């Protein structure tokens, strides 16, 4: 199942000495044994998908935080996962960069990608999530359909949280 799951972390975890294109082709070539040309084709498609294809020849240090996170997303997509896991993908970004990354994730959701997202971005979650799990101190406090979670929270802790952020 690991081969069918892509991950995007809080930190971008890009190889600083490799170009954006090489960051995206490394795993498909080494893990999936794809020919370099095919891996580059897939990488360019995914860089286009997250709107940074024009950055392919640059190195991570030459990109903004939002561009680096979108590169990390493209890199994960190059493995053609069925499920994407996101661990606070916007937490290391400046506010103006957050929208860039969330827009790319919204596009994935609209394309039908199954995503499990750890986030504090409730507007984003409300827009794209089918189901919500609210956790506090590592414990599940509430599970609900997104509409019910926001419209009719059950636990006092969830109500308090929503009253503070909405």
Where do the language-model regions lie?
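ABC family nucleotide-binding domain
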Residues: 1-146
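C-terminal boundary and immediately downstream tail of ABC-type ATPase nucleotide-binding domains
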Residues: 143, 147-166
């Amino acid at each position: 199942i690991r081969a069918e799951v892509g991950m995007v972390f809080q930190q971008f975890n890009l190889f600083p000495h490799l170009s954006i294109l090489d960051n995206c082709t490394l795993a498909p070539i080494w893990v999936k044994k794809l020919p370099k040309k095919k891996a580059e084709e897939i990488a360019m498609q995914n860089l286009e998908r997250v709107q940074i294809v024009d950055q392919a020849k640059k190195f991570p240090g030459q990109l903004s935080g939002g561009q680096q996170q979108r590169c990390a997303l493209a890199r994960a997509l190059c493995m053609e996962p069925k499920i994407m896991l996101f661990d606070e993908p916007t937490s290391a970004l400046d506010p103006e960069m957050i929208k860039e990354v969330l827009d790319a994730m919204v596009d994935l959701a609209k394309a039908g990608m199954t995503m499990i997202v750890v986030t504090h971005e409730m507007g984003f979650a409300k827009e794209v999530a089918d189901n919500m799990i609210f956790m506090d101190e590592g414990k599940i406090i509430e599970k609900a359909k997104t509409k019910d979670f926001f419209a009719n929270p059950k636990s006092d802790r969830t109500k308090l949280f929503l009253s503070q952020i909405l």
